[in-house]
Design a protein with these regions (language model features):
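Cys/His-rich short segments
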Residues: 116-169, 173
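Phosphate-backbone binding interfaces of nucleic-acid-interacting proteins
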Residues: 512-634
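Intrinsic disorder at enzyme termini
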Residues: 471-533
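Secondary-structure transition/capping motifs at alpha-helix termini
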Residues: 1-3, 37-44, 65, 69, ...
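Structured secondary-structure scaffolds
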Residues: 2-49, 101-105, 155-370, 414-416
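N-terminal catalytic cores of NTP/NDP-binding nucleotidyl/phosphoryl-transfer enzymes
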Residues: 2-76, 95-111, 115, 132, ...
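Helix-rich, typically C-terminal accessory recognition domains appended to large enzymatic cores
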Residues: 121, 344-381, 392-491, 591
């Protein structure tokens, strides 16, 4: 017998800064569904997850709690593992970056990269965001705050070791271009290429001296290894990679990884930083990195003060494990963010699980017991409608496989539930209760119930990857296809008002003083204009190809802006917010048909669009996605 093909799947490791909410939990459930499905196809699956446990943020949180960082991460890692287990995830390895073998291997990897000239010592000066553990230049900040999370940043300067990213950039670009499946979805690949790789990579800071909670650089112990060479190496250390000798059999068997599942917010680290580290180590790159969308709270951002944070264990208490698994897997689009709320959970449970699935199984098992004492055989009394049910049943596994190969897990689940819906329609078409009234149609009735049991069983077997407990319960009720058990309710319908009342008892809203929202500004309204007035203005995307300060002015910059095939000179009062050097290369939004005028004696042929906050800070309006110079703004 030939060996089973291997399949190595990983999630990002969870940061141990606090209890994960349902949005954090989605990723592990998604990975589990894929891992289970691959096992059902005969793959030898190795599924790794774990926790990221070092960093300044954890050091500060431990200090606030009055405990050591290790005590702090032990508590949080234990809670994360408890929730992963609660969600019935079938991981094979749970790695912690505080594990001794991981820390030792990270030190060896750091030394190897240093010895071969990929890492060097220097100084880092910039703005630092503690929650994101990232440095930024002034020009990268958004309104003076972290461009990733929007929180305040602090100036920082420290000695650090750097990795020569540019040394491998061209090689990575070539790899991505020749391996279109490497970064998925395609929109994430385009983002990485256009926003990071093609503009050029800066060398990456890979050590810190301003905090101690990390893996020491053994040949320079005042430094600790920064997150990039720590957390991002777990995917190889967890399966026994050794950079200075023979790696373990588990690594040799499973590397390169077949699939890395990570959130879209950290795809840059996993598709640029980590592949370059692997190239430097002489290792092949993973076959695919999938940046999944986010699961968002239905009524806005999750906030403890509003009492609207959704945690997996609390959802499980209300709905059960498989109902929660079903929702997060079924409601997440392939690329766009999904939404979750108590109301949506109740609606989906009642509609899909209690009605479509639960009612189908209950009716089928009940009728089999009522009319045949729980035992049926195929009497072969067929009608045309049977052929369609059989065709749908046989085609569903093919459709599911196609969707799973594309990582369209929600669509795969839809195909399974389409089969269950077809079974319900089959009941309406064949009307077993009417057949039961005619003794001459007894064999036809038994054939109908036999067909139903076979089709539902086929769907239940497919459902195992997504809802393992429910699959097991259905197959147990349906027995071996001949003898069924007594019917049991799979999912109870819920009343939304009762659920919300219990939720309010569990999480009463916290009264807090109303504070001015710094992200909202009210300005005095101007008189309304007509569509005709607005239509007179022409807005286009422009690219700044040159910029210089306007002499004898403290406020003005003069930019040469390429708009389509023409270049316009535009003078703007933004000198206090941008340097001339920063402006060059920016894509901006331009009012192009503004009547030319002179500012400080310099001709200006248009206007750059900016936003201004309450403190007078300006930010240029730029396209959200790459757009060509000259593109119309409409």
């Amino acid at each position: 017998m030939a060996d089973k093909p291997k399949y190595y799947i990983t999630t990002a490791i969870a940061y141990t800064s606090g209890k994960p909410h349902i949005g954090n939990t989605y990723e592990i459930v998604l990975a589990d569904a894929i891992a289970r499905y691959k096992r059902s196809q005969g793959y030898d699956v190795f599924f790794q997850t774990g926790t990221d446990e070092h960093g300044q943020k954890i050091e500060l949180k431990a200090e606030e709690a009055g405990i050591t960082p290790k005590e702090y991460v032990d508590n949080v890692a234990g809670e994360i593992k408890r929730i992963w287990d609660l969600m019935n995830t079938s991981y094979d390895k749970f790695i912690r970056t505080t594990d001794d073998y991981h820390e030792k291997e990270v030190q060896k990897i750091f030394k190897k990269l240093y010895d071969q000239g990929d890492i060097y010592k220097g100084y880092y000066e910039g703005m630092y965001c503690t929650p994101c553990e990232s440095f930024f230049t002034e020009s990268q900040l958004v309104d003076g705050k972290c461009p990733d999370c929007g929180r305040p940043v602090q100036p920082a300067k420290e000695e650090a070791y750097f990795f020569k990213m540019s040394k491998y950039a061209d090689r990575l670009i070539d790899y991505i271009n020749t391996h279109p499946e490497f970064i998925q979805p395609v929109s994430r690949k385009n983002e990485m290429m256009n926003n990071f790789l093609l503009p050029g990579l800066q060398d990456l800071c890979v050590s810190r001296t301003s905090f101690k909670w990390g893996i020491p650089v053994d040949f320079d112990p005042k430094h600790v290894t920064y997150v990039w060479l720590d957390a991002l190496t777990n995917y190889i250390t967890g399966i026994g990679y050794h950079c200075d000798g023979e790696s373990e059999e588990l690594f040799n068997k499973n590397w390169p990884a077949d699939l890395h599942l990570i959130g879209k917010d950290i795809i840059r680290f996993h598709t640029i930083y980590r592949p370059i580290f692997l190239m430097a180590l002489g290792l092949p790159l993973p076959k695919q990195v999938f940046g999944h969308p986010w699961l968002l709270q239905g009524d806005g951002k999750m906030s403890k003060s509003k009492g609207n944070v959704l945690y997996a264990d609390e959802l499980v208490d209300f709905f059960g494990v498989d109902a929660v698994r079903y929702f997060v897997l079924h409601e997440m689009p392939f690329e766009n963010d999904g939404v979750i709320s108590w109301e949506l959970m109740v609606e989906r449970l009642n509609s899909d699980l209690a009605n479509t699935l639960g009612n189908l199984v209950n009716r089928t098992v009940s009728m089999t017991n009522k009319y045949f004492g729980g035992t049926v055989t195929n009497k072969g009394v067929t009608e045309e409608v049977d052929a369609d049910l059989k065709a749908v049943t046989e085609n569903t596994p093919v459709l599911v496989e196609k969707k799973m190969d594309e990582l369209r897990v929600a669509d795969a689940m839809t195909e399974i539930f389409n089969l269950f819906k077809r079974c319900n329609k089959y009941i309406d078409e064949t009307m077993p209760w009417a057949l039961a009234k005619d003794e001459a149609k007894k064999d036809r009735l038994e054939t109908v119930l036999w067909n139903l049991i076979q089709s539902i069983s086929a769907g239940a077997r497919l459902l195992e990857s997504f809802m393992p407990e429910t699959s097991e319960k259905i197959l147990a009720q349906l027995g071996d296809g001949h003898v069924v058990e007594k019917p049991e309710i799979l999912f109870q319908r819920l009343d939304i008002n009762e659920v919300l009342a219990k939720v309010e008892e569990l999480h009463p809203p916290v009264e807090e003083e109303k504070e001015e929202d710094e992200n909202v500004i009210d300005i005095e309204a101007k008189p309304e204009i007509t569509f005709e007035d607005f239509g007179k203005m022409q807005f286009q995307v422009g690219e700044i190809i040159a910029c210089e300060e306007v002499k004898k002015s403290k406020k003005l910059l003069c930019s040469q802006v390429k708009i389509g095939s023409q270049v316009k000179q535009i003078v703007s009062g933004i000198k206090a917010h941008y340097t001339a050097e920063e402006m060059v290369g920016k894509k901006v939004m331009v009012l192009v048909n503004l009547k030319p005028a002179k500012l400080a004696g310099v001709l200006s042929e248009g206007m750059l669009l900016c936003a201004e906050d309450a403190d007078g800070n300006l930010a240029l309006m730029t396209p959200e996605k790459p757009m060509p110079a000259g593109a119309e703004i409409c």
